[in-house]
Amino acid sequence: MRMKKCPNCKNYTLNTICQCGEKTITVKPPRYSPTDKYGKYRRMLKKSIKQ
């Protein structure tokens, strides 16, 4: 079983059909990269949330 997301209502589910009746799509995590382009911004956001 894989987690799926409804493109219509943006809900996550394990079913192939969402409660709204739309067919769900498989959610894929972002590809790993040693040179993370957005790591700087993610760390800045994390710091601002902690403060």
UniProtKB/Swiss-Prot annotation:
The keyword Mitochondrion does not apply. Gene3D superfamilies: H/ACA ribonucleoprotein complex, subunit Nop10. One of its GO terms (cellular component) is ribonucleoprotein complex. The keyword Membrane does not apply. Pfam families: Nop10p (PF04135). InterPro entries: H/ACA_rnp_Nop10, H/ACA_rnp_Nop10_sf, Nop10_arc-typ. Keywords: Ribonucleoprotein, Ribosome biogenesis, rRNA processing. Disulfide bonds: none annotated. One of its GO terms (biological process) is rRNA processing. GO terms for molecular function: snoRNA binding. Belongs to the NOP10 family. Involved in ribosome biogenesis; more specifically in 18S rRNA pseudouridylation and in cleavage of pre-rRNA. This is Ribosome biogenesis protein Nop10. It comes from Methanococcus aeolicus (strain ATCC BAA-1280 / DSM 17508 / OCM 812 / Nankai-3). The gene is nop10.
